[in-house]
């Protein structure tokens, strides 16, 4: 439902928006290094990168959109923050409480040019909410758009990057989700930019302007590029932000979750410290996902090192769902301080069939070697040879179930496990 609402608003408003942010006047910050080989706006676009005081590890938190859409207010935001504490989510590492679209009034302040928080929704203002979130030891996120309006029609930040970044910093904002709706036609791109240089495309420059504006405030802000996988963002995203959306919105269905895993699996070389492919907000607690599909949803986001932003009314999570999203071993892999790279697909055996998404993944952490197995079909026994796991070789190995912490035994040369329909096995492996 979220994708249809966002895109519907975007398309309707996009048809009405005139090119209010012309190329000659849109940049609100100056370049730190112009290139003589570039022309037009690219020649003067800012090149400064994102702060490395934040964003080293993929974000853990919550976002309001999937739970409440536009029906938000400070009571709901602060309720989520307090539930981080009472449900043990903060202890598990979750820290960002993020406000999505629909938080401001529909027009900017006439004298300051600033976006104005809707006083009927946020009577304490964003700064007042930030103070209360910070008092809990958590961080606050806000939402804007690299277009003239947000997806729901509220003021966007294109052409107003400096004034908006200054406001966000003054309010104590720690995280910015920056969407991609209502882009004027003169800020769009041809099918392929000159020299296939997507970093200097109009799309990238819209985001680079906000990077520079955030940097100028002096306050480190985790910058999330909600660019829907456009403009080959995985090629340049780490030069502009800390994470970047790889697709349109995920929905609470197996087909949506599996398709996003498949799409992301093609671009895992871009994932490392300060550099994360964002597979979108979580749907655990929403829709009709089976228990096994919710486990896979969480596990895949964890082992592929996507940001994990919960997207439901936290009051409604049951104990089983809480156990999934607080699983200590999967979160430890996701947040590993030594190894920044994700698990990647490998061929389990010489005769293993090809699937979409891939079923077998292997990765390293500071605790050892891990294998993750997604069953894309009905319940079946899955087998892999230790010698096919990168870095293992053949021999005898101890295998531990990461979901339960249970030791499964010692095995020679290969390992087999029964995996339920659409479930994921998560294994930690050490040489015996």
Regions found by a protein language model. Name each.
Residues 58-64, 93-100, 139-144, 174-179, ...:
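Structural recognition of the beta-strand scaffold that forms the well-ordered cores
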Residues 163, 219-313:
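Glycan-recognition surfaces
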Residues 138-156, 211-232:
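Aromatic-lined carbohydrate-recognition surfaces of secreted/lumenal glycan-active proteins
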Residues 301-304, 309-311, 352-392:
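Carbohydrate-binding surface patches
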Residues 80-195:
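Aromatic-lined carbohydrate-binding/catalytic grooves of carbohydrate-active enzymes
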Residues 1-25:
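Fungal secretory targeting signals
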Residues 21-78, 83, 221:
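N-terminal module-boundary/linker segments of secreted carbohydrate-active enzymes
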Residues 409-432:
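C-terminal beta-strand-rich structural cap/linker in extracellular carbohydrate-active enzymes
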